[in-house]
């Protein structure tokens, strides 16, 4: 800022501002002045554009007018929300000195920094989505990645081995803010992401990170957390924790542990798979018609967030999964009773985070009290559920009767938004506060009692007690009786017909009343802070309770979904394979107006790959995706949309389904497709579920068919992954004859004239034709084009009548070896018998042959 160059020429207030701004050069500074937050110079110009507020000028400093923009302090949350949503960070600078006693500018300091990844205010957060701060580190051995949800205290780290895994983690976690080192090499991995923050290298130093984390957790080492031997992850975690402390300007007592996320603990899905399966976000970027939109009928925001974490990290530990299945089964008869009570619990998890940060507002404490009030009824209902996991959750959620009683005594039923508004602490909680309030609310009772007492004591019937704004409280006696005023009455004011006096008792009372409002508010703030001190020792137990309540909400929700949507409990088997009876697509069946056609699936070590053929729009992609979604649902412990499911171990789910040009990166559809295919061929194992749709269609027929053939061969023979391979290359239907473990299935259709009916039913064997022209007609392609296409198709089929069933053996592709076309004139001459023609017919034939040439 150019203003700093001529620092001494500025006014004292602007000097104070410039010093504070120099400490936060990269972010906006909200500088408190009375009832406004002001922004100056470049900050003012940026804020006026980002917030669409007026840019004005404030006098002059150092001889130059100062660009200025301002926002009212009471509306600051709305403006912060707008800035945070645009990826901006804001330093909040408050007046901490007393204007009455300050010489020069009132003392100010930055009390907190609001950034996209460290917000905890209810107004700034989306209640049903996690809001993560993340840090990324890279060295020659791979990546380190750490995430922190400051609104819950959830702290995670991982060490992705390669670029693809790191990209998948970024897509899964979708951080609101991402810290990276100034020498980070893979900038193309993170470019274009929101909330990028470049940090100096020393913030990622490993020894500093260990020291920071041990200090935070009160430990001597990190062995107990299982992260001791994760140096890259620790580098990221250390930078992240320091950043969180710097922005919050307070301790973070709710961050009490860190967890290592290992690849072997969950089913791995790359970025393309998460996108294609539309788990929580559809291909258009919205939330409609996603798996989460069908499964998420949770009644608390923290339950909704937990369910989405489960969906993005399916677990492989069958003990955990069987426990969840058992719990869902046990809860199915209790959902109607439990959900209305759970709904009243609210977002306890985030309230506790604000409590830990000492930013909880009065209504947060009222909601916490309301949550505590639900616990006895919840525990009573759960007592009847015959399930060990449910009883474990019941114990973990606790009851907190003492804290409930404390908040019932301390906080009024409907408190105001802010403690500075007053009227938060309930009457009867603190005797001194009640006295100050009684004074502040009016002195009528006291003054009436004083008047009666003084009349009786002095015998003066004209004596009365009053108040005016200039002289304060007084005792008034008529001029006729003023000579009888007691000696301790000090004259305060003389009127035409009366004298006004003050006595020490009334003066003392006046001082009390005039300061009582300020005193009441100050004491109320003190008592409110003391409530934090009384609640915070229970923070760990409260966080465990919130976690148990969120998990209960998820499991009750999955029980309700299973019952309502007619899902079945899947069975886990030891060998690789998936057997599905009457499987359905969980999302498509909800949006269809007609009944969904259920289909079977059988994959096993002896039947590892299905070659799927059939018409466009016939249901190939739906069939493939439903298989992956059923597997995904099974591995979060949910029931699944099918009549019966047996499923073996799965380590990864891959999808190569559909593609679009990646214009921003300069990659064509075919390049995107091949990149995803390469990732699958490098990383799939015999325990992987692979969906391959239309491989090779973005290049020439020779190249495409060759690639598709080789990929299918590699997956079936070498990798031996469980594979669904949809294709329009009918040559691939010969694969089952050439290798073991491959089978043909197809989705059929019926064609009648110019119309087509898709059966959506999976049958064994290869499809007889692709019905491409019928689908084109259905799509509205002009009739003359369809007519010409049919004509051309007949010509091609007459040239190579067995095209669909040609033999392929690596070097020969007879479909592509099209014989030379025979002229219609030659065909006509071959069929002509000249001896049988009359002269007139011979002449007609000459003209006809001429027209055929």
From Swiss-Prot:
Belongs to the DNA mismatch repair MutS family. One of its GO terms (molecular function) is mismatched DNA binding. ATP binds at residues 614-621. InterPro entries: DNA_mismatch_repair_MutS, DNA_mismatch_repair_MutS-lik_N, DNA_mismatch_repair_MutS/MSH, DNA_mismatch_repair_MutS_C, DNA_mismatch_repair_MutS_clamp, DNA_mismatch_repair_MutS_core, DNA_mismatch_repair_MutS_N, DNA_mismatch_repair_MutS_sf. SMART domains: MUTSac, MUTSd. This is DNA mismatch repair protein MutS. The keyword GTP-binding does not apply. SUPFAM superfamilies: DNA repair protein MutS, domain I, DNA repair protein MutS, domain II, DNA repair protein MutS, domain III, P-loop containing nucleoside triphosphate hydrolases. The keyword DNA damage applies. Keywords: ATP-binding, DNA damage, DNA repair, DNA-binding, Nucleotide-binding. It comes from Escherichia fergusonii (strain ATCC 35469 / DSM 13698 / CCUG 18766 / IAM 14443 / JCM 21226 / LMG 7866 / NBRC 102419 / NCTC 12128 / CDC 0568-73). One of its GO terms (biological process) is mismatch repair. One of its GO terms (cellular component) is cytosol. This protein is involved in the repair of mismatches in DNA. It is possible that it carries out the mismatch recognition step. This protein has a weak ATPase activity.
């Amino acid at each position: 800022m150019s203003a700093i160059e001529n620092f001494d020429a500025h006014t004292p207030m602007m000097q104070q501002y410039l010093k504070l701004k120099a400490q936060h050069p990269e972010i906006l500074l909200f500088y408190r002045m009375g009832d406004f937050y002001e922004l100056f110079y470049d900050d003012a110009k940026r804020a006026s554009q980002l917030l669409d507020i007026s840019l004005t000028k404030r006098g002059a400093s150092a001889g130059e007018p100062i660009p200025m923009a301002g926002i009212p302090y009471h509306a600051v949350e709305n403006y912060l929300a707008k800035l945070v949503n645009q990826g901006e960070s804001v330093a909040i600078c408050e007046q901490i000195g007393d204007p009455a006693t300050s010489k020069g500018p009132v003392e100010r300091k930055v009390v907190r920094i609001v950034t996209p990844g460290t917000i905890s205010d209810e107004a700034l957060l989306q209640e049903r989505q996690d809001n993560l701060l993340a840090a990324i580190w890279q060295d020659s051995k791979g990546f380190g990645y750490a995430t922190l949800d400051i609104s819950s205290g959830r702290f995670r780290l991982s060490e992705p081995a390669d670029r693809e895994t790191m990209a998948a983690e970024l897509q899964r976690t979708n951080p609101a803010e991402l810290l990276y080192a100034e020498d980070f090499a893979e900038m193309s991995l993170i470019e274009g992401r929101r909330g990028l923050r470049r940090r100096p290298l020393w913030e990622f130093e490993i020894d500093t990170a260990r020291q920071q984390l041990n200090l935070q957790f009160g430990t001597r080492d990190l062995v107990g957390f299982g992260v001791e031997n994760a140096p890259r992850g620790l580098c990221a975690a250390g930078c992240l924790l320091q950043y969180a402390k710097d922005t919050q300007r307070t301790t973070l007592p709710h961050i009490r542990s860190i967890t290592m996320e290992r690849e072997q603990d969950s089913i791995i899905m790359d970025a393309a798979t998460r996108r294609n399966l539309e788990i929580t976000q559809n291909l258009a970027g919205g939330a409609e018609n996603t798996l989460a939109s069908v499964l998420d009928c949770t009644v608390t925001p923290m339950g909704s967030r937990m369910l989405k974490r489960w969906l993005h990290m399916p677990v492989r530990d069958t003990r955990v999964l069987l426990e969840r299945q058992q719990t869902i089964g046990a809860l199915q008869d209790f959902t109607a009773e439990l959900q209305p009570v759970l709904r009243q619990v609210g977002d306890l998890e985030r309230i506790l985070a604000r409590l830990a940060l000492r930013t909880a507002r009065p209504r947060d404490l009222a909601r916490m009290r309301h949550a505590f009030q639900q616990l006895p009824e919840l525990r009573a209902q759960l007592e009847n559920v015959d399930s060990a996991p449910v009883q474990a959750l019941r114990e973990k959620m606790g009851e907190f009767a003492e804290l409930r009683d404390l908040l019932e005594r301390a906080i009024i039923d409907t408190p105001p938004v802010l403690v500075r508004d007053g009227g938060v602490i309930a009457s009867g909680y603190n005797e001194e506060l009640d006295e100050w309030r009684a004074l502040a609310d009016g002195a009528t009772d006291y003054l009436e009692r004083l008047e009666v007492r003084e009349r009786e004591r002095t015998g003066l019937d004209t004596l009365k007690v009053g108040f005016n704004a200039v002289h304060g409280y007084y005792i008034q006696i008529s001029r006729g009786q003023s000579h009888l005023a007691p000696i301790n009455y000090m004259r305060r004011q003389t009127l035409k017909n009366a004298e006004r006096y003050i006595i020490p008792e009334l003066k003392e009372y006046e001082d009390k009343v005039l300061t009582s409002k300020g005193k009441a508010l100050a004491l109320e703030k003190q008592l409110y802070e003391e409530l934090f001190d009384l609640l915070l020792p229970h923070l760990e137990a409260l966080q465990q309770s919130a976690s148990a309540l969120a998990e209960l909400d998820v499991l009750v929700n999955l029980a309700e979904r299973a019952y309502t949507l007619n899902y079945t409990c899947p069975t886990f088997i030891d060998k690789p394979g998936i057997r599905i009876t009457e499987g359905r697509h969980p999302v498509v069946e909800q949006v269809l107006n007609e009944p969904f056609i259920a289909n079977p699936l059988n994959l096993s070590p002896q039947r590892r790959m299905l070659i799927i053929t059939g018409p466009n729009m016939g249901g190939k992609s739906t069939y493939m995706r439903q298989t992956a979604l059923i597997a995904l649902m099974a591995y979060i412990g949910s029931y699944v949309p099918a009549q019966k499911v047996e499923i073996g171990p799965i380590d990864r789910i891959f999808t190569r389904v559909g593609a679009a040009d990646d214009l921003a990166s300069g990659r064509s559809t075919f390049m995107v497709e091949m990149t995803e295919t390469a990732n699958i061929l490098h990383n799939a194992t015999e325990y992987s579920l692979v969906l391959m749709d239309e491989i090779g269609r973005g290049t020439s027929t020779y190249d495409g068919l060759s690639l598709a053939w080789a990929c299918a061969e590699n997956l079936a023979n070498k990798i031996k992954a469980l594979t669904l391979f949809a294709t329009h290359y009918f040559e691939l239907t010969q694969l089952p004859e050439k290798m073991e473990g491959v089978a043909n299935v197809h989705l059929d259709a019926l064609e009648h004239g110019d119309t087509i009916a898709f059966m959506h039913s999976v049958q064994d064997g290869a499809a007889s034709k692709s019905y491409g022209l019928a689908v084109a007609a259905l799509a509205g392609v002009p009739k003359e084009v369809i007519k010409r296409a049919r004509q051309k198709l007949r010509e091609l089929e007459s040239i190579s009548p067995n095209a669909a069933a040609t033999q392929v053996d690596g070097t020969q592709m007879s479909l592509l070896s099209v014989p030379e076309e025979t002229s219609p004139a030659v065909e006509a001459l071959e069929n002509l018998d000249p001896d049988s023609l009359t002269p007139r017919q011979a002449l007609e034939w000459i003209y006809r042959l001429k027209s055929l040439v």
